[in-house]
Amino acid sequence: MEPAGERFPEQRQVLILLLLLEVTLAGWEPRRYSVMEETERGSFVANLANDLGLGVGELAERGARVVSEDNEQGLQLDLQTGQLILNEKLDREKLCGPTEPCIMHFQVLLKKPLEVFRAELLVTDINDHSPEFPEREMTLKIPETSSLGTVFPLKKARDLDVGSNNVQNYNISPNSHFHVSTRTRGDGRKYPELVLDTELDREEQAELRLTLTAVDGGSPPRSGTVQILILVLDANDNAPEFVQALYEVQVPENSPVGSLVVKVSARDLDTGTNGEISYSLYYSSQEIDKPFELSSLSGEIRLIKKLDFETMSSYDLDIEASDGGGLSGKCSVSVKVLDVNDNFPELSISSLTSPIPENSPETEVALFRIRDRDSGENGKMICSIQDDVPFKLKPSVENFYRLVTEGALDRETRAEYNITITITDLGTPRLKTEQSITVLVSDVNDNAPAFTQTSYTLFVRENNSPALHIGSVSATDRDSGTNAQVTYSLLPPRDPHLPLTSLVSINTDNGHLFALQSLDYEALQAFEFRVGATDRGFPALSSEALVRVLVLDANDNSPFVLYPLQNGSAPCTELVPRAAEPGYLVTKVVAVDGDSGQNAWLSYQLLKATEPGLFGVWAHNGEVRTARLLSERDVAKHRLVVLVKDNGEPPRSATATLQVLLVDGFSQPYLPLPEAAPAQAQADSLTVYLVVALASVSSLFLFSVFLFVAVRLCRRSRAASVGRCSVPEGPFPGHLVDVSGTGTLSQSYQYEVCLTGGSESNDFKFLKPIFPNIVSQDSRRKSEFLE
């Protein structure tokens, strides 16, 4: 807020500008129109369009209107014709009282640009009031010794009309003693005087009754009468005389009721009743509304009503002093009303625009006029508004002010302003008037919708039902009304191969997203697209957000056993030497699961066995191993059923059936892996050297016992028949892979070749790591051979 010392220069500048405007406008001659009082409502007064040199259409475009001094609605501008017409009957006496001429000041306001044309309407008087006397009967006491030509003042009649329609003449009923003389005061008003023509004789006629008639100058003339009772008294030598013929006093307008204005004093040289004086008020310039009261005994004049300098600035009174003998004297009292700062400044709003668009700088919000009924310094004013609003005042002509915006407003920051207009006069003490106006700011579409998040991640479990609600996006708009109404849409995907319109849809009103079809995690794990939010303003504004949909895997795939194959053909038979140690690797069940995550975590367990406790299955890798030492009492042929189960909910499973044959003195040649195995090709070089060395030693040993082993194998016919395995033609399904990261194919194994009867194709199966058993087997065979 600015310090007071900084604001006073601005206020002085505004005051100086107003004074300059007043001086400038004083040279303009206002247009004057006239109309008779009591003219009917709607009567033609003037053609303002022609007088202003404007077209009728231009008056409407510029918002022409008529503003009067006291905001009276007596005049109206017809924008269709450009004519100034009466909006109501005008009563001159009510508008101006005795003031002549009766002039109504008004202005014609035009906007875009702002122009003010001053004009006056003269309301002429018609003779619509008759003269009226203040009393129904007047009583005069006249001594019989009064000389001829003696003048006796009479109370005048009052007529609300002015000019020639006021009282012009007085006459009295025919009689032999008196006639009436009509006198004219300085203000032009007429008053009667009774003049004695012949001597009076109390003994002949003690009283007379006459009729006084007041006649105005109207056409036709109007009149009023009063009865005069004249009482003839005995001789009275001296008439009362006032100390002063003229009393001049000044009274502040804020004097309280009952205050003493002045005391008049008269004296009479007679004694007794002839010297007793009484005072009376027999003429006032404002008899319609007299604010004074005269004491008949003391001559004190006191206020009985509040004075108002702005209504009447002076009063003229005639005081009569009468003695008991019927003689009288008179004096005049001139009362000047002194102006005090007793009127608060006034503000009248001519136009107010609310709401106003938020993006409209230098926009006129209000046009108003200020005035102070006081005079001099008491009537000078300063107009201001508070500092914390983006508005300013621009002085115009004829005490008009324009309230305009300083710059563009922002409805989203503030949608309503309460502006207090303060008017302070320069009187002592200073009087202040405040008036508040409310200005609403209308919305302009200057804010785009904003999503609550720049990106959304939605999770959908596969195998969902079509039309499933998968999530929502939300955007808000800081504007209001239709500018804040948001509609949602799917934007074209950046990936041209993504069938977005067949995957999801969006509710344009609330941003709800729906899946249009059942999603398959194995076919589509995730996809993303953009959504748009557009408001309904003009022009429309929009924004966009990214939506990422992640398809959650469901346990909809059972484990698939890769080895041993479960295709209904002759199963492979695994050969296990009876000399195998506990933990001997018989084979490995290899399985995969098309799901992911824990749905693809596989576990193995031995479901059935010919001889429980002989074999065991490792739960995590599917390796089938011997659980104890084999003996000759164990049956040679075993059937194992291995259960492969995933970790889904609910879990899915598959089974693998194995044939295991226990043999005596069985060994297997080493066969190198195919060159195509990428994992073996990348084995550690040290391991390769060790394997080569071990293979060389084994080869030398095998060569020494080759004939012996071959003879033993040939003797066992069943060994030849069960050594075959059947493998289906064609590769394994390519999509069956282990996705667990620790699947059953994570280790490297050697393979052996099985030749099936009647076929020249080579098949494979896992080669059991027999090297640790060769030494023990060879030792046993050597002992047998030596025996």
Curated annotation (Swiss-Prot):
Task: Say where the protein is mainly found.
Answer: membrane
Instruction: Tell me which Gene3D superfamilies the record gives.
Output: Cadherins
InterPro entries for this protein = Cadherin-like_dom, Cadherin-like_sf, Cadherin_C, Cadherin_CS, Cadherin_N, Protocadherin/Cadherin-CA
The protein's GO terms of the molecular function aspect are:
calcium ion binding
Q: Which residues form the signal peptide?
A: 1-26
Annotated membrane-spanning segments are 691-711
Q: Which GO terms describe its cellular component?
A: photoreceptor connecting cilium; plasma membrane
* Presence of the UniProt keyword Glycoprotein in the record: yes
Q: Which UniProt keywords apply?
A: Calcium, Cell adhesion, Cell membrane, Glycoprotein, Membrane, Repeat, Signal, Transmembrane, Transmembrane helix
List the glycosylation sites: 418, 567
Residue intervals on the Cytoplasmic side: 712-787
Question: Which ranges does the record list as Extracellular topological domains?
Answer: 27-690
| Top-level taxon of the source organism | Eukaryota
Question: Where does the record say this protein resides?
Answer: Cell membrane
Q: What Gene Ontology terms for biological process does this UniProt record contain?
A: cell adhesion; homophilic cell adhesion via plasma membrane adhesion molecules; nervous system development
Q: Where is the Cadherin domain?
A: 35-133, 138-242, 247-347, 352-451, 456-561, 568-671
Write down the PANTHER family for this protein, in alphabetical order.
CADHERIN-87A (PTHR24028), PROTOCADHERIN BETA-15 (PTHR24028:SF97)
Q: What does this protein do?
A: Potential calcium-dependent cell-adhesion protein. May be involved in the establishment and maintenance of specific neuronal connections in the brain.
Name of the protein this chain belongs to:
Protocadherin beta-15
**Annotated organism of origin:** Homo sapiens
The organism that produces this protein has a lineage beginning with:
Eukaryota, Metazoa, Chordata, Craniata, Vertebrata
Q: In the UniProt record, what gene is named as encoding this protein?
A: PCDHB15
